[in-house]
Amino acid sequence: MPSPSSPFGHNPAHPASAGGRIAFVQACWHRDIVDAGRDAFAAAMAERGHPADAIDRIEVPGAFEIPLRAKLLAATGRYVAIVAGALVVDGGIYRHDFVASTVVDALMRVQLETCVPVFSMLLTPHHFHEHGTHREFFLAHMRTKGREAADAVLGTLEGHRLLVAAPRVAA
C-alpha cells in the first residue's frame, strides 16, 4: 500500500542502490533451473552494488502461488521490489499458457494495487522435455532472464527515485 511519503509504497530513502530489500519469490518446480535465474539475478545485482544478503529468497510450491505471496510481501512495507521466478511447462494435463497468463496478470495487479514494483521471470516454453539439451537451453535462458531482471529492477527503482525527488508542479 502506498505510504504518505511515497507514491510507490516504500521509503524513497531506500532505493535498491541504498540497501532496500528485494524479495525473490520462486516456484519449487524445476528448482535447479529457477535457481540458476535467481543466482544470475543476485550476481548481476551484486555487480551493481546491491548485496546478496539484501535479497530474500521465498519459495512457494508452484507458479500459481506466487501472486498471493507477492501481495503479502508487498503489504509488509519491507521490500522496494519483488521478483517472481518460475518455469511453467506443459505437463500434458492443462494448458500451461493459461497458468502463466493468469500468474502474470495477477502480478501486474499486485504492483498496481500496492505500488511495489513486481518483475516477472516466468518462462513458458512451447515445448520442454526432461532431456539434457532442453535442460541446458533453459538453464542458460533463465540465467539471461536473471540478468535482465536485475537491469529492470535497478532501472525501475532509479526511475521511481528520480520521480519522487523531482520538484512538484502546482496544479
PLM features per residue range, with description:
Residues 12-57:
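Glycine-rich phosphate/diphosphate-binding loop of Rossmann-like nucleotide-binding domains
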Residues 23, 56, 80-82, 116-122:
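Structural motif
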Residues 28-29, 86-88, 122-128:
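Short, ordered loop/turn segments at secondary-structure junctions
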Residues 65, 69-107, 111:
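Glycine-rich phosphate-binding loop
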Residues 17, 32, 36, 40, ...:
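Conserved active-site and cofactor/substrate-binding residues in soluble primary-metabolism enzymes
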Residues 1-21, 166-171:
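SAM-dependent methyltransferases
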Residues 47-76:
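Active-site rim loops that border cofactor/substrate pockets in soluble metabolic enzymes
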Residues 96-171:
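C-terminal binding/interaction regions
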